[in-house]
């Protein structure tokens, strides 16, 4: 992934609040363990560059488990084209190994529940955040820090395996994005303390553009390509035995 142009947030607000000629809306259901206001405004802006008018569901943040376990969850997401699950381990301030295990186990259960409840949906994609590395080792011992990083790697590997088995599951590689931006430049600690909005302007640009690319690609019609093995048909078969009479070929054959 190459460097991107960073769009300031004030420009985003100015442009998304202007009236657009885009009539149809794309419905997106989203659940996060942080305040997604800024991130979703960025996603909305970048989707509008592709003539896509995104409408995000209004859900309370940090209610992922409760929402997915709700008996009404399937009904709520049925009319949405995309479901985004964004959970960031660096916004869960714990460095206890058992709690980390529980955190990842909950995410695995949530993922399996969603895939089970949506397997009969025709036009539907689940966009799921993988886990970044820990922001700091300050609050834990070096040995525990290494163990937690290993658990993160194992969880991300689990997600990759699931995405290969489920065509409707698409991963957002937050781990890689955090390394591109720089883990220390990825999070805005002061803003998170005030408003529970975790990411810096640069991080929001990178994450939102990645998500908008995913959504745009899924919404656009895919072209099909037919590959013909001419070596064994025309050249070694018809042309080799019959000649070129009756076959329309260009002047460069």
Which role fits each region the language model picked out?
Residues 1-251:
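Extracellular glycan-modifying ectodomains
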